[in-house]
Amino acid sequence: MFTAVAPPQETLPRDLVGAIQSLKKELNAVILAHYYQEAAIQDIADYLGDSLGLSQQAASTDADVIVFAGVHFMAETAKILNPHKLVLLPDLEAGCSLADSCPPREFAEFKQRHPDHLVISYINCTAEIKALSDIICTSSNAVKIVQQLPPDQKIIFAPDRNLGRYVMEQTGREMVLWQGSCIVHETFSERRLLELKTQYPQAEIIAHPECEKAILRHADFIGSTTALLNYSGKSQGKEFIVGTEPGIIHQMEKLSPSKQFIPLPNNSNCDCNECPYMRLNTLEKLYWAMQRRSPEITLPEATMAAALKPIQRMLAMS
């Protein structure tokens, strides 16, 4: 559940970054931002990372206020880990197509049809789905977590079918997959990937495991956003075709300014494939959220208590 406020009518300060820094001190706040946020937000964040890193930071912060520049399931996770702290999300409409693809009631029925199965849910899901899960995972640790389970343990993996299939291939484990997907990674075009490879024959193809198999089979490296960033920095390659949300390219260019990064387009005429939900957050909205102490993330106590256990299990197994 989210607490909304009317759009602000006041004038923005001229020095927006300076005003945000002042509010951060006043509130004893920390700004956590995902790699898919706009560059201006990435540059002002106290911690920038992928879902695993952001969860670890949320679990360990001593700040009184958490300003989460990401999407709602990320802010929910921060609230679950910090039930007594103020957690702010700049735009309440910053949802997630993957999380939306797994409705709690339908998933509960799906779970009942597969008794004796342990439920591993990708962190890109709602608090209600987390509460129905045994272990949460991220793209950084999904393979590692599955490898720690007994070989005869039956597994449900939700909600991303592409990540689930990738984990099955990496571990050799059979899993029952919920058929959800991410609109960004689902719509990358193999045809346009091959066209780019012809245009940039020396380019390495790096891709997120949420991509379809048609994309991953061409990849030189597959990994989480953090893994892709690290690989691009260490590789001797000079050109990279990037198969994930292009927000990460800002950090890739900062890490390796002499290298070229080409965003993989989708099937439309767009030359990139931005997440429309991630891009709802702006520096201006972040300022208003801090200035007004709202919109605040709130969740039922019972849901938070149930969802906390699988998150803690993930952190312990990572």
UniProtKB/Swiss-Prot annotation:
Return the protein name. Answer: Quinolinate synthase
Question: What does it do?
Answer: Catalyzes the condensation of iminoaspartate with dihydroxyacetone phosphate to form quinolinate.
**Uppermost EC category:** transferase
GO biological process terms held by the UniProt record: 'de novo' NAD biosynthetic process from L-aspartate
Question: What's in the keyword line of the UniProt record?
Answer: 4Fe-4S, Cytoplasm, Iron, Iron-sulfur, Metal-binding, Pyridine nucleotide biosynthesis, Transferase
Cell compartments where the protein resides: Cytoplasm
Which cellular components does GO assign to this protein? cytosol
Q: Which domain of life is it from?
A: Bacteria
Protein residues bound to [4Fe-4S] cluster: 96, 182, 275
Q: In which pathway does it act?
A: Cofactor biosynthesis; NAD(+) biosynthesis; quinolinate from iminoaspartate: step 1/1
Q: Which family does it belong to?
A: Belongs to the quinolinate synthase family. Type 2 subfamily.
Protein biosynthesis recorded as keyword: no
Origin organism of this chain? Synechocystis sp. (strain ATCC 27184 / PCC 6803 / Kazusa)
Its gene name is: nadA
Catalysed reaction equations from the record: iminosuccinate + dihydroxyacetone phosphate = quinolinate + phosphate + 2 H2O + H(+)
List all membrane-crossing ranges: none
The reply to whether Acetylation figures as a keyword in the UniProt entry is no
Any binding details for the cofactor? Answer: Binds 1 [4Fe-4S] cluster per subunit.
